[in-house]
Regions:
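Acidic, metal-coordinating catalytic cores used for nucleic-acid/nucleotide bond scission
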Residues: 12-16, 129
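Short polybasic/polar patches that bind polyanions
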Residues: 27, 141, 187
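Active-site cores that bind ATP or allylic diphosphates and position pyrophosphate for catalysis
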Residues: 34-175, 193
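A glycine-rich helix N-cap at a beta->alpha junction
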Residues: 1-13, 22-25, 29, 34
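Surface-exposed charge patches
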Residues: 24, 138, 184
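Charged phosphate-binding loop/patch that engages nucleotide di/tri-phosphates or the phosphate backbone
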Residues: 192-200
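Short, surface-exposed amphipathic charged segments that create phosphate/polyanion-binding patches used
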Residues: 21-27, 165-170
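A conserved active-site cap/scaffold subdomain adjacent to cofactor or substrate pockets
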Residues: 181, 186-188, 192
C-alpha cells in the first residue's frame, strides 16, 4: 500500500534502557512516585487514592510507578484535524502509570521516548488515541522533549461500535487491490484522489 519506514523500526522490547533513563530523569525532577496499592485499593478508574504519593519511595521499589500530575494541570494543544483540545489532566486522569508493577514500561512513556529518539515531528493516528495525547504531552514537557504536531483521524467501526482493527478480528487488507483500498480510505476521510492515482 506504499507505506514504508524512513528508518529502522524501533521495538519496545529492546528499548528498556532508554525508558529506564527517562524514568530516572523524571524521578530526579520529582515527577514520580511508586504505588503499592492493590487493585482493591484503587478506585474504579484505577487511580491511587492512598498515601503512596507522600511516602518516601524510589523507582527501584518493585511497585507500579506513577507520574505526579498536579491537581491544576491543564494540557492544551491544537489537533490538525480535531481542532483545539483542552484537558484538565489533574482533574480527569490524575496520576497515571508509567511503569507497571511487573516491570514493563507503560505505552504512554514508551511512545514519548521513542518519538523523541526518532525526531518525530508529526503524529497521525486514530481518534481512539486522542485521549492519550495529553498524558504524552505532559511527559514531553517534563522531559524537555519537543512536542510533535498531532492529527487524529476518524476510525472505522463495526455495527457494534468496535474499532475495525486486527485486534477485533477485522480481515486483512488485500494487497492485490491496494489502489482500491486507498481510494476507499480517502473517501471515508472526505479526501480527493491524488493526481498519481487518477489513472491507476
Amino acid at each position: 500500500h506504499g507505506l514504508h519506514w524512513d528508518e529502522p523500526v524501533l521495538y519496545q522490547s529492546t528499548r528498556s534502557a532508554a525508558y529506564t533513563t527517562a524514568l530516572a530523569a523524571l524521578a530526579q525532577g520529582g515527577h514520580l512516585f511508586s504505588c503499592d496499592c492493590s487493585r482493591g485499593k484503587l478506585d474504579a478508574d484505577g487511580v491511587c487514592r492512598g498515601d503512596c504519593r507522600t511516602r518516601q519511595q524510589t523507582i527501584a521499589d518493585p511497585w507500579a510507578i506513577r507520574a505526579i500530575v498536579p491537581s491544576d494541570c491543564a494540557i492544551r494543544f491544537a489537533d490538525l484535524l480535531q481542532g483545539p483540545q483542552h484537558t484538565a489532566l489533574g482533574a480527569s486522569l490524575a496520576d497515571f502509570v508509567v511503569r507497571r508493577k511487573d516491570g514493563l514500561h507503560a505505552y504512554q512513556l514508551a511512545v514519548v521516548v521513542d518519538d523523541a529518539a526518532q525526531g518525530i515531528t508529526h503524529v497521525v493516528r486514530g481518534s481512539d488515541l486522542l485521549d492519550s495525547t495529553p498524558r504524552q504531552i505532559f511527559l514531553q514537557q517534563r522531559l524537555a522533549y519537543a512536542t510533535p504536531s498531532y492529527a487524529h483521524l476518524p476510525v472505522i467501526t463495526t455495527g457494534q461500535g468496535q474499532k475495525f482493527s486486527k485486534q477485533n478480528h477485522a480481515p486483512a487488507l488485500d494487497n492485490d487491490h491496494a489502489v482500491t483500498n486507498l481510494r476507499h480510505a480517502l473517501r471515508f476521510l472526505h479526501q480527493a484522489d491524488p493526481p498519481a492515482m487518477l489513472n491507476a
